[in-house]
């Protein structure tokens, strides 16, 4: 009988940059493509920046930014134009082999725990609806995210803008 996998969710460190970039680029177009300088900037803007390690190997990550960042994303700016107090899940990505095994649920639970600890009120994010990202839409619906609007992006993608209160069930 094999042992259960060892899952660790931890803060991203500078030495993780190449691996995080690799995972990010493997998930385009679900997440935007970035170069090393842009990823370094995103990490610096993210007070919650988490890596997911499975048996000692980084298989996923997420970056969460505050509502007072200078971040220039059109989706982030949609939220800042409408809300004063939120954290923005800029990107979450896993390598293909790690998807569908509950790691996203564990990662979101840790983001939620950290937000409650910090006193943050809501987590905001967007999910592609045209073309649809059905697995992501279902994942976020199960976690209590509610659509607060939609927008067409300059990249030809329509997104569902969603929010969830930190610490709420889901």
Regions found by a protein language model. Name each.
Residues 29-55, 63, 69:
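Active-site rim helix/loop that mediates acceptor-substrate recognition in acyltransferases
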């Amino acid at each position: 009988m094999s042992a259960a996998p060892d899952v660790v969710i931890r803060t991203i460190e500078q030495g993780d940059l190449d691996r995080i970039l690799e995972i990010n680029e493997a998930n385009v177009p679900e997440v935007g493509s970035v170069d090393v300088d842009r990823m370094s900037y995103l990490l610096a803007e993210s007070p919650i920046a988490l890596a997911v390690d499975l048996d000692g190997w980084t298989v996923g990550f997420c970056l969460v930014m505050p509502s007072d960042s200078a971040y220039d994303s059109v989706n982030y700016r949609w939220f800042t134009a409408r809300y004063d107090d939120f954290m923005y899940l800029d990107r979450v990505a896993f390598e293909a082999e790690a998807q569908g095994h509950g790691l996203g649920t564990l990662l979101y639970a840790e983001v939620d725990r950290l937000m409650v600890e910090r006193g943050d009120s809501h987590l905001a994010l967007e999910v592609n609806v045209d073309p649809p990202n059905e697995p992501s839409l279902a994942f976020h619906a199960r976690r209590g995210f509610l659509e607060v609007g939609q927008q067409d992006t300059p990249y030809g993608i329509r997104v569902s803008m969603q929010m969830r209160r930190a610490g709420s069930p889901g």
